[in-house]
From Swiss-Prot:
The protein's name: ATP-dependent helicase/deoxyribonuclease subunit B
Biological process per Gene Ontology, one example term: double-strand break repair via homologous recombination
Keywords: 4Fe-4S, ATP-binding, DNA damage, DNA repair, DNA-binding, Exonuclease, Helicase, Hydrolase, Iron, Iron-sulfur, Metal-binding, Nuclease, Nucleotide-binding
Enzyme Commission no: 3.1.-.-
């Protein structure tokens, strides 16, 4: 029994010496004693390859490469102890979830923390750390007693409570494992116990290579190997000079020096012979003098400079994507020009979450075979999502999001259906569920779902059309596709008495859905597309899910568990599942994390993402215990993993390892911006390398080839997929600035695309965008007639929409596009309710031959409640009755109608105008409808403007009959003559024209009526600010002012007094007008003469004719208006359709100049030739 150290700096040949010794021994004595070659998990594959890589050794039974966990499995297979069930990380998390849920009420710190994402991952890591450092539950309990007895500050009490919680959970976890299960850390503890019994290990030659430190648990294994084996050889990366000096925590080799001393101490304790250390002083790894210099003088202060040509390259990139593309181009150059194999190249990085997706895309585009050494979670795989969402459906009462997350996995689809068709149907089905607010018991009820197109509150026709019946049948068929398998599982879960029966319910759910066959189809399709890595995912995920169910049953099978806890535990297990990474080929670029990689035999290393805070890493205090808490535990004798401070001290060694992996070339790069454009800083580490290699230039990498010389641009011509974007870049330059001399070879590249049989069609789609103009071509007369017909019938709102943006009109009325209907109460629904409520009250008053003035406050309140109760079941598929929240909203809307009724009562008392008709249709056909506003357009097309007028009021005096329009609005609005001029506000003047043109409808003896005005009535329940001693009458007066109607009224003092009979001088509280003492109107009055009203009505006719002409002639310009801070695009539903983009020359707003009313009126006169 002996111990031997092989030490040396990085690249000194430690591993090579050990491998040569083993290979020589195998040649001399192929059937001798066992040779164990122990390496970290990440090194096992490459070490096995190196061991049998010589021509003299093609295979071996005597020598085996192991990791600690693999050796444990081997020994336990030999001597026993492996019969207990192994639980993996997912099983550990599930067991911990169950323990936490059962212990929740007794936990102090972790009761709420358990609901946070990642909690069980941290808890599992903490328990694993306890085990690796030989800390038992009793040790933790003793620590708690000690802390609890001496806790005085809040921080100390928090730590004591945290340690108490950890002790409870750790103890429960260990009790659950005893005699039945083994987790990964238990294997190592069992290995320590069983090694003395192993004949396989007894007398073995042991090599331990590639480690820099050992946990206490691993150190115990090393102890037993020294006792049982013939000789143990351990390699450590240490400079021999370091061993001759006192241990200094700032030394580069501090960590490995401590490891060296610990192992020697173990050897002394066990009286193991310590052989003479073998120091290796040469640098055989490095074929480059520069890399040898970097390794030898890495820690020197001040930095030792290397002059001359160096094989170290530094790049600064404009952004992350440019950096990765630069790496890809250089890899292709090394392979093409310097005869590198892809396996000779490695890319090292730390913040993989920022890089991996970009690297997958770009390396694929550059045709670079690559393998990313990272564990990918299974949580996004359709199978995992299907199980998780299906359980959420059941435990969460069939919520919309859970249902359609499950649907979109496509595993609920029948096996024999065409997926494309099913997707389209499910999209329609989802739209129905959104529109009808389907959730909860409606899914499980046997009552068939109804389908009716929602039209209006007045539509009480119960007849169902054929198309509605057909849609109804489809919806109920799709409902059964979705709900039937889930309901079956739901019933089984409710009947289940044990966890085993609940797991069986999940398994039967998957089996009845034919999930194995569906996953096989996905695997075949992935292989056909060349995605071999992802093809294996579908096999792995089924095996892992089955293993998870088996583990669940083995651990908790006979226990009873609530559905909610079962869902939580299952979800925790599913979240922990990960894909095993199996390299699909041997010749590929390895992409690995700096902290986990153990590279060897690479010629070129690319270290990317070398930014401040990343390399070296910024301090990160994460996990269950903070650094301060770890220090407290360490002072009390509990050794745990290194603190952040210790980790930072080890960072220099990590970076030293990072830059000494390559034998020939080292590339270091950093981006100056991330994918979102956020600024990043270069690391201080790059400055250090620059000081060591002052002759090395920092090369800037950009995506814009225009900034480069012709020779540099040639390197950007790579694969056809990649180069196409740069061709586009050059052609854009040509288009903007004309031909330049350095574009000539790009024309050759362009010619390749347009003449290549393979690329001609593909490139044409991309190259056509060069001449892309986001301009809507005018429709032909034939197409316009097909879309709109020979007779146009449209509302005033439609005409206004055309003037806001012709393309929006085309999208809505030509293509009939609309947003999907959502089961929610929007402003239009509320507006519709207000109109309907006020109409019902007014209709009742007309039937009873009463006016608003006749109502009492109590009657206003009663009628408001009655009409809201009548309307609520009719509005938006009974939305106001669908939930407590909507019921509360119904009460608020009732209060608004009540307040509005009171104001209408006050208005009626003060006014000579009375409502004579409500919701007056024109051009709608049927009894009671006024005729439409008709136009014969120059191209022969007939156009009718139709609509519905909220309220028509009439007043009479000795001067004649006057009619006015009242329009109810749920938001404040005034009539802007500038908007009238631009055709954006035509509604009120159109209504006034219609009623005055058909005045005989409301005249007892026939005759004509004059226009009295148009007013907007704002329906709301305002809040007013008053002094604390204000009387009730003063408060009511202030409220009345908030309801002042804005608009345009006839400039006749008598007519204005008819609207507000309390007005003598001053401003009216009812309308936007006021009188001076001399009887003239105040400056702020919104008035127009009768002649001006006539001009406005002529202008409205003129505008409609122009709109009709443009519609029928196919005008669909993408030309939205902009006036001040108002723009057509602000609330437009079709922005994603027109893709209006101000950065394009063709896409600019029609900027409308704001004008005073007098200026606008003058322009209107000019247009119609009015006086």
């Amino acid at each position: 029994m002996s111990l031997r150290f092989v030490i040396g700096r990085a690249g000194s040949g430690k591993s090579t010496l050990c491998l040569h010794e083993v290979q020589e021994e195998l040649k001399q004595r192929p059937r001798g004693e066992t040779i164990l070659y122990l390496v970290p998990e990440q090194m096992t594959f490459q070490t096995q390859q190196a061991l049998i890589g010589s021509e003299d050794v093609r295979g071996s039974i005597r020598a085996q490469v192991f990791s600690f966990s693999r050796l444990a499995w081997k020994v336990l297979q030999e001597v026993g102890g492996a019969s207990r069930l192994h639980i993996d990380e997912a099983g550990v998390h599930m067991l911990l979830r169950k323990i936490v849920e059962s212990r929740k009420d007794g936990l102090s710190v972790f009761q709420k923390a358990a609901e946070q994402n990642g909690f069980f991952e941290h808890l599992g890591s903490m328990i694993a750390e306890f085990k690796r450092y030989n800390v038992t539950p009793s040790n933790v309990y003793e620590m708690w007693q000690q802390l609890d007895a001496h806790s005085s500050s809040a921080e100390q009490k928090l730590l004591a409570n945290k340690v108490y919680d950890l002790q409870l959970l750790y103890d429960d976890f260990e009790r659950a494992l005893i005699g039945k299960y083994l987790d990964s850390e238990d294997y190592l503890q069992l290995l320590v116990e069983k090694l003395p019994q192993s004949e396989y290990v007894k007398g073995a030659e042991v090599y331990i290579d590639g480690f820099h430190s050992f946990s206490p648990q691993e150190l115990e294994i090393v102890r037993q190997l020294m006792i049982c084996g013939a000789r143990v050889t351990i390699t450590l990366t240490i400079d021999e000079k370091t061993l001759a000096q006192p241990v200094n925590e700032l030394d580069l080799f501090y960590e490995t020096t401590l490891t060296y001393e610990k192992i020697k101490q173990v050897a002394r304790e066990e009286k193991i012979e310590i052989e003479k250390t073998i120091p290796l002083m040469e640098q055989p790894r490095f074929h480059s003098p520069a890399l040898a210099h970097l390794e030898m003088h890495y820690e020197a202060r001040p930095n030792e400079k290397f002059h001359g040509e160096a094989s170290v390259t530094i790049h600064t990139a404009a952004n992350l994507r440019a950096e990765v593309e630069g790496v890809a181009r250089e890899i292709r150059r090394l392979v093409a020009e310097e005869n590198y194999r892809y396996r000779d190249i490695a890319v090292l990085l730390r913040n993989g979450e920022s890089y991996y997706d970009v690297m997958r895309t770009l390396f694929t585009d550059y045709n670079i075979p690559h393998f990313i050494d990272e564990k990918r979670p299974m949580s996004h795989h359709p199978l995992v999502e299907c199980i998780r969402s299906a359980l959420e459906i059941i435990s969460g009462n069939w919520r919309y999001d859970a249902v359609f997350r499950c649907v979109k996995t496509e595993l609920l689809y029948p096996l024999d259906v065409r997926k494309e068709t099913m997707r389209e149907e499910m999209d329609e089905f989802e739209n129905y569920c959104l529109a009808y607010g389907v959730q909860g018991k409606r899914w499980t009820s046997e009552d068939p779902w109804m389908y009716r197109r929602y039209r209006s509150l007045d539509d009480t026709n119960g007849m169902i059309t054929d198309s509605e019946r057909e849609m109804e049948e489809k919806i109920n068929r799709l409902r059964d596709v979705v709900r039937t398998p889930v309901i079956r599982m739901q019933k089984r879960l409710k009947r289940a008495g044990t966890v085993m029966q609940m797991c069986e319910a999940v398994y039967l759910f998957l089996e009845e859905l034919d999930v194995p066959k569906k996953l096989e189809a996905l695997r075949i399709r992935a292989e056909e597309n060349g995605d071999f890595l992802f093809a294996t995912d579908h096999e792995q995920v089924w095996e892992e899910v089955m293993s998870l169910l088996d583990t669940f049953v083995e651990m908790l099978g006979e226990e009873k568990m609530s559905l909610s806890m079962f869902t939580d535990v299952m979800s925790t297990g599913l979240e922990a599942l990960q894909f095993a990474n199996i390299p699909p080929s041997l010749d590929q670029v390895l992409i690995a994390n700096i902290d986990r990689s153990r590279l060897s035999n690479v010629k070129a290393t690319f270290v990317i993402g070398v930014n401040e805070g990343v390399i070296p890493a910024a301090p990160m205090d994460e996990g269950m215990l903070s650094d301060e808490e770890r220090d407290v535990l360490s002072a009390a004798g509990i050794e745990l993993a290194p603190t952040t401070r210790q980790t930072l001290l080890e960072e220099q060694f990590v970076m030293y390892q990072m830059v000494t992996r390559a034998t020939e070339k080292l590339y270091i790069s950093c981006p100056l911006a991330d994918e979102e454009g956020k600024t990043l800083l270069a690391s201080s580490f790059i400055k250090k390398i620059k000081r060591m290699f002052p002759d090395v230039k920092d090369t800037f990498i950009t995506n814009d080839v225009n900034d480069l010389s012709r020779l540099e641009q040639i390197s950007y011509v790579a694969t056809p997929e990649v180069t196409l974007s740069y061709v586009m870049q050059q052609l854009q330059t040509w288009k903007r600035y004309g031909f330049e001399g350095n574009l000539d070879f790009w024309w050759d590249v362009y010619n390749f695309y347009v003449t290549s049989d393979e690329w001609k069609q593909k490139s044409s789609r991309v190259l056509s965008s060069l001449f892309y103009r986001n301009r809507a071509q005018k429709l032909s007369t034939a197409v316009s007639r097909d879309l709109y017909g020979d007779k146009i019938k449209g509302s005033v709102s439609r005409m206004e929409l055309f003037n806001r943006c012709a393309y929006a009109h085309f999208a809505q009325h030509g293509l009939s596009l609309r947003e999907r209907d959502i089961f929610k109460l929007d402003a239009p629904d509320i507006g519709e309710l207000f109109h309907a409520a006020l109409k019902r009250i007014a209709d009742r008053l007309l039937r009873e031959n009463r006016t608003w003035a006749d109502l009492s406050i109590k009657e206003c309140e009663h009628l408001s409640a009655v009409v809201i109760e009548e309307i609520a079941p009719l509005l938006q598929r009974q939305i106001l009755l669908s939930s407590n929240r909507h019921f509360y909203l119904k009460q608020k809307l009732q209060q608004i109608i009540f307040r509005t009724s009171i104001i209408l009562r006050e208005h009626a008392k003060s006014s000579g105008f009375v409502p004579v008709d409500l919701e007056v249709p024109f051009g709608m056909g049927g009894t009671g409808s006024l005729p439409p506003m008709e136009f014969s357009l120059p191209n022969g097309v007939k156009m009718e403007v139709v609509g519905r007028i909220d309220r028509v009021d009439k007043a009479e005096d000795e001067n004649g009959t006057f009619l006015r329009i009242i329009d109810y609005k749920s938001s404040s609005k005034a009539l802007d003559l500038t908007e009238v001029y631009y055709g954006l506000a035509l509604q009120m003047l159109t209504y006034l024209d219609v009623v005055t043109s058909n005045a005989q409808t409301w005249m007892k003896k026939g005759g004509t009526a004059s226009p009295a005005g148009v007013l907007y009535f704002h329906i709301h329940n305002p809040i007013v600010e008053v002094k604390g001693d204000a009387s009730e009458a003063e408060i009511e007066k202030e409220i009345l002012k908030k309801f002042k109607m804005k608009g345009l009224v006839l400039g006749d003092a008598d007519v204005v007094r008819l609207m507000d009979n309390k007005l003598s001088t001053g401003s009216s509280d009812i309308i936007s007008a006021g009188l001076k003492k001399d009887g003239s109107f105040s400056a702020r009055s919104s008035i127009a003469s009768e002649q001006e009203f006539n001009v406005l009505q002529k202008y409205v006719h003129h505008t409609f004719e122009n709109i009709g002409k443009d519609i029928t002639e196919g005008v669909i310009d993408i030309a939205p208006y902009k006036k001040g801070n108002k723009a057509a695009c602000t609330f437009c539903n079709f922005k994603s359709v027109c893709q209006f983009d101000e950065s394009l020359e063709d896409n600019q707003f029609r900027t409308l100049k704001d004008m005073k009313d007098s200026e606008a009126m003058e322009k209107i006169r000019e247009e119609v030739g009015g006086e």
